[in-house]
Amino acid sequence: MGKYDVIVVGGGPAGAVAARECARWGLETVLLEKEFLPRPKICAGAISAAAMNLLDVPIPPEIIEARCSVFHGFYGARQITIELEQDFLVLVSRDIFDFWLVSLAQASGAEVKQGEKVIAVDPGAGGVTVRTSGRVYTARVVIGADGVYSTVARAVRKPFFKKDLAFCVCSEIGTVERDVPWQEGVEVYYGLTPVGYRWIFPKRNRVSTGLGVWPSCTKTVRAAFLDFLQEKGLVVDRRIRGGHIPLGGISRPAVNDGIILAGDAAGFADPFTGEGIRYAIASGRLAAAAAVSLLSRSVPPNRQNLGVYERNCYHSFGADLKAALFISRLFQYFPRVLLGMFFNSREPFAESLQILQGHTDYRQLYRWLLWHTPGLLRRSI
């Protein structure tokens, strides 16, 4: 039986960041990943500038496939273009990006075990027991960063309600010739489904394209996505992959005795844009900080003492996700009114992109919308 200070389950951004931080602070740490890295991931591969600011090391240039400072928005016959002086996101291949993050954790002293699927997590008086497809491990703290379908989360909370899960499908497609180069910027299409959006993101020799929808519109996602590809003259040459995204901003338990949830496993994702990497990195660091703080002082990592992690997450980004959820609900209930308002002026989109750059947040956007909505609505009627 392997015994550790910390077991991290999941080799995505949340898990890799948490494992690296724990190992750097001298905790005996192992990261368990069910796949063999690098492995494919359902993701557009967009990393916001705000997310990059949370990393203490720059992303290597060879991993970055495109830098984006131009946003093209489409809504029916309307189009809006926002050009910023600084990038608001970069595009990567998630398999390579995640592998790089795990390599950083390994270089910092974390042990990495691949191809071990966690099948059960049992907290007890002597620590937390983790059973995998191959072995049994114990640790004083387990950090569950194993995604939206988390096994670790079963020891913390009930499964996500279906109404609290958005859905997306995506694929990467070889580039085709067109009048306007794909590399000019990201393209986002609204209004083609009642609530949600479709995207085309440029990469080196292909484009990442997909469709994300709110919970009420998940039944016809694949058909709607294929119609979109046909309209754009894109032919799928890779598998279409789909998965759920938890709506952040909803109060859920994220800790139990000896257990911390991070990233999608904790429900930390942007309910307005679907961004998850930013909150995976943030929560991974906070999870590691909580584990290091308690274990280094020989404080029992029970539910009560780990509550500091939940409070830190709320103050760091949780309150802002609540504001994002409120704004996304407004779009869900009044899509035509709000999209009409957004596409009648550059200001709402420009303000929204500032969030991706880390210059503002959803609470400030909410206040901005309260102040400016009456005038914007008059101009859109």
Which residues fall in each region the model found?
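C-terminal helical "tail/cap" subdomain of flavin- and related membrane-associated enzymes
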Residues: 292-381
